Amino acid sequence: MARPDMGGPKSSGGFGGPRSGGGFGGGGYGGGGGGGGGYGGGGGGGFGGRGGDRGDRGDRDDRGGEEGGRRGFGRRKVCRFCADKTLKVDYKDQSQMKYFLTERGKIIPRRISGNCAKHQREVATAVKRGRMLAILPYTVGGM
C-alpha cells in the first residue's frame, strides 16, 4: 500500500525520483514537471529552481569575450604547504591553525584558503583534533 506522503502512484508530491513528478518542490530533482522546479521550488528546474527568465542580465554567452563572462583578475592561490616544504600541518600550533578557521570557528573551504586537496584534508583532521583537545574552539559566541 502506498503512503500518500511518499509519492505513491496516486500522489503528486512527496519524495519521488527525477521523472516521477514528486520531488521536494513538486517537480522531481529539477524536472520542472508539475509544481515548482526542484528543491528550491519556483523557476524552471534544477536544484535551486532558478532557471527560466534571466531578465536584464542576459545569458553567459552574451557577456562578451570568448570565455563567456569569466572574470580574468586575481591570482591563482597556491597551497602554502606545497610551496614551503618545511611547513607541516600541526594541530598544536594554534597560530597556524587560525588561518584555516573563521571568526565563528568554522573550517575555511579550500577554494578560499588555497590549500590543495591533500593538505586541506590534513588541516581538517588537525582542526578536529585540536577541537577535541580544547586547543581550538568548536564555535565562538552564542545566541
From Swiss-Prot:
GO cellular-component term (any): cytosolic small ribosomal subunit
Residue ranges with Basic and acidic residues bias: 51-70
A Pfam family matched in the record: Ribosomal_S18
Taxonomy, superkingdom: Bacteria
Record carries keyword Ribonucleoprotein: yes
Region forming the signal peptide: none
Family: Belongs to the bacterial ribosomal protein bS18 family.
Quaternary assembly: Part of the 30S ribosomal subunit. Forms a tight heterodimer with protein bS6.
Designated name of the protein: Small ribosomal subunit protein bS18
Species annotation: Anaeromyxobacter sp. (strain Fw109-5)
Encoding gene per record: rpsR
